[in-house]
């Protein structure tokens, strides 16, 4: 069992807002909050671009480090 430090980074939304690209992103990938109530038998996934916590995981010898987003 390993413990990883939790690091707070910028969300994709924050990055896009800083660059002035958030509105274009939302137009290209619209958010439909009522979609989950449709009676078509599917469960749509949405990307709100607001994941901001991650950890650094190192694997191998020599170690290679990866940023891993903890989204659940």
From Swiss-Prot:
Keyword Transmembrane helix carried by entry: no
Keyword Hydrolase: yes
Domain Peptidase A1 stretches: 53-72
Keywords: Aspartyl protease, Hydrolase, Protease, Zymogen
SUPFAM superfamilies attached to this UniProt entry: Acid proteases
Propeptide, residue positions: 1-37
Domain of life: Eukaryota
GO biological process: proteolysis
Pfam family, one: Asp
Enzyme Commission identifier(s): 3.4.23.-
GO molecular function annotations of the record: aspartic-type endopeptidase activity
InterPro entries in alphabetical order: Aspartic_peptidase_N, PEPTIDASE_A1, Peptidase_aspartic_dom_sf
Family: Belongs to the peptidase A1 family.
Name listed for the protein in its UniProt record: Pepsin-2
Origin organism lineage: Eukaryota, Metazoa, Chordata, Craniata, Vertebrata
């Amino acid at each position: 069992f390993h413990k990883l430090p939790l690091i707070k980074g910028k969300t994709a939304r924050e990055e896009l807002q800083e660059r002035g690209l958030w509105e274009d992103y939302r137009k290209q990938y619209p958010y439909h909050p009522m979609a989950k109530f449709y009676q078509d038998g599917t469960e749509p996934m949405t990307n709100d671009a607001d994941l901001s916590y991650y950890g650094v995981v190192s694997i191998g010898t020599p170690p290679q480090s990866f940023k891993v987003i903890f989204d659940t």
